[in-house]
């Protein structure tokens, strides 16, 4: 998985993985990043890594207006090829 950390293989060829935010997605909303259209992955969670108490530690099932920050981690679902394409971007 290149830059991705494989968390769980759901079925043959499909996994849930944690990846760093690609540079092209930092400081964009999920709608602006358009990851599903560009790579086919589904973002299940945005995990916040900073200690800022004003930001939640995790955004479960994020919506199109949820912001992606450079220091976040994305928990995504997709095929190995889709996840590799996304994690190779960053």
Residues of each region from the PLM?
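Cytosolic Rossmann-like ligand/nucleotide-binding regulatory domains
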Residues: 27-90
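Flexible, Lys/Arg-rich cytosolic regulatory linkers and terminal tails that connect or flank
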Residues: 1-27
